[in-house]
Amino acid sequence: MEITHSFSVSGWRLGWMVIPDSLVEAVNALQQNMFINAPTISQTAALKCWDDETTEELELHVEKYRRSRAVILNKLSLIPGIGSEKISPPDGGFYVYIDVGDENLAPGFGTVAMCKAFLEEEKVAFTPGSDFEDPNYNLGDRRFRISYAGGIDTAERAMERFARFFPKWLELVKSNQ
């Protein structure tokens, strides 16, 4: 478990693993070279994560993320060229991962170019899949990621802008195929 993601305290880098006995030696060797230990203040603060007040606050955050995710998934389902079959179901984290498909690509018009154009035209940042995919398979240029951590209003505005932008982008792609 990683406290930083589970309790919305990014940067703390505090967590633990439950592993089979057969992996303890190998994981310990890796861990010793990656981290020395979590700072004492982080360890002490982490204890607060399990009290009732923190649990209630965490539930409010989780509900906010659920509502933002629902807004994004709903709005994406209404955009021509983005069907639900092209959306990886969000399972952990606070991101939606979308595959535009080979049919919506042209040389020089993948998701890196799309995300750049979207940022320039609509002032909204999505992340191209090339940041997450193995470059040997060329899947990153047809995928992109949307964060829903910004809240419902932010999600609604971003999706309104994307709904306006994406059809124009597809026309540009088609004219360059």
Regions found by a protein language model. Give the residues of each.
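Conserved glycine-rich beta-strand-loop-beta hairpin in the small C-terminal domain of fold type I
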Residues: 47, 63-73, 85-101
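Short, conserved charged micro-motifs
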Residues: 104-114, 153-157
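Short, solvent-exposed loop/turn elements at beta->coil junctions and helix N-caps
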Residues: 3-4, 83-85, 130-135
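Residue-level recognition of strand-loop junctions within catalytic nucleotide-signaling folds
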Residues: 20-21, 51, 99-101, 149-151
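Short beta-strand segments
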Residues: 1-2, 88-89, 95-99, 128, ...
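PLP-dependent enzyme catalytic core of the Aspartate aminotransferase-like
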Residues: 117-126, 132-177
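Conserved core segment of the aminotransferase class I/II
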Residues: 1-66, 73-77, 164-166, 171-174
